[in-house]
Amino acid sequence: MRPQATLTVLPVERPLVGRVSPPGSKSITNRALLLAGLAKGTSRLTGALKSDDTRVMSEALRLMGVQVDEPDDSTFVVTSSGHWQAPQQALFLGNAGTATRFLTAALANFEGDFVVDGDEYMRKRPIGPLVDALQRMGVEVSAPSGCPPVAIKGKGGLEAGRIEIDGNLSSQYVSALLMAGACGKGPVEVALTGSEIGARGYLDLTLAAMRAFGAEVQAIGDAAWKVSATGYRATDFHIEPDASAATYLWAAQALTEGAIDLGVASNAFTQPDALASQIIASFPNMPAVIDGSQMQDAIPTLAVLAAFNRQPVRFVGIANLRVKECDRISALSNGLCAIAPGLAVEEGDDLIVTANPTLAGTTVDALIDTHSDHRIAMCFALAGLKIAGIRILDPDCVAKTYPGYWDALASLGVSVQR
């Protein structure tokens, strides 16, 4: 574990003005790394994120015989035979949910015994629904605790057929099945059940990446897809900036009435979390109810921004935040209440931020427990722009997805104390 250091963001007294280039998208980078590893040939991935989450994915591929070179700080060059070898050791994936779920399904397409494992936090994050789905497809896979570690006995390819999975659950399970399906022994149909489809935008990211790497995917109605067993073709692939990272900068601009140029328009993103830009633009008149189901990684940003809104905000459709890197609903509620008692309330799986714009300019004594969750650390830094005395525990956990976050704030004139 990282040492429990703290960091304090010092309030700013002027608008934040400058240019910051957000890092590449974590979601797209790990999809592209997986697909490049499954493809035969050499793929060049530009604009990529280099962080803890993408490092564990690239290292896992290397352990299985895939060559992954890094000629610069935003490029991966992936050369693969299209066949992975079972390593002698477990694939350790830290607390990277994308890498863990995506690899668990993909490994069913290869021969050998594999173990997918993670750190103490990943070992508390559910993977049972994906394991159950793979078992129904004939894969020999087990995760006795319902969380990693996961043992997979690969038999050379997913069997052709149809698999149903609850669309209310994590979109990462669905993406994992879709991406693995193209390397199976025959066509695979993935159908969603349930009353709602959570995080549909992330499925669109998956389908776009699959098609870019040569997969043939056909939509069957609104909630099912047929994936042909074509495999993947190596390709050059550019990765857009991370929309979740952009939300912190959009919010910093809104809070300080600044002008931060990200080098990309908010409507140019394909990632679903970019939807938050419209809500941030409405600050300090954010809506009374915000449905977070399609932009879950943006909710921490919006929740802290809502603390300074002119009216209370209820966040709905965010139940999956309880099984992210930590229980983000509770972490947000506890952190906001550390700043001001009663500033947030949990009602079931909803989060209500009561809002108090008069907090700006005050001084508090608040220690924010991030639970080593990068998004909790980054979002509460925003509160520090307006309120003195907010200390953030384990600030270096931002390395999971945005290693340069504190430097980015410094480049805009924000001072921090460690």
From Swiss-Prot:
UniProt-annotated binding residues for 3-phosphoshikimate: 26-27, 31, 170-172, 297, 320, 324
Any GO MF annotation of the entry: 3-phosphoshikimate 1-carboxyvinyltransferase activity
A Pfam family recorded for this sequence: EPSP_synthase
Pathway: Metabolic intermediate biosynthesis; chorismate biosynthesis; chorismate from D-erythrose 4-phosphate and phosphoenolpyruvate: step 6/7
Annotated residues for binding of phosphoenolpyruvate: 26, 97, 125, 172, 328, 375, 400
Biological processes, Gene Ontology terms: amino acid biosynthetic process; aromatic amino acid family biosynthetic process; chorismate biosynthetic process
Annotated active site: 297 (proton acceptor)
InterPro entries: Enolpyruvate_Tfrase_dom (IPR001986), Enolpyruvate_Tfrase_sf (IPR036968), EPSP_synthase (IPR006264), EPSP_synthase_CS (IPR023193), RNA3'P_cycl/enolpyr_Trfase_a/b (IPR013792)
Top enzyme category: transferase
Catalytic activity: 3-phosphoshikimate + phosphoenolpyruvate = 5-O-(1-carboxyvinyl)-3-phosphoshikimate + phosphate
Entry keyword set: Amino-acid biosynthesis, Aromatic amino acid biosynthesis, Cytoplasm, Transferase
Binding partners and assembly: Monomer.
HAMAP family documented for this protein: EPSP_synth
Family according to the record: Belongs to the EPSP synthase family.
Protein name: 3-phosphoshikimate 1-carboxyvinyltransferase
Organism the protein comes from: Pseudomonas syringae pv. syringae (strain B728a)
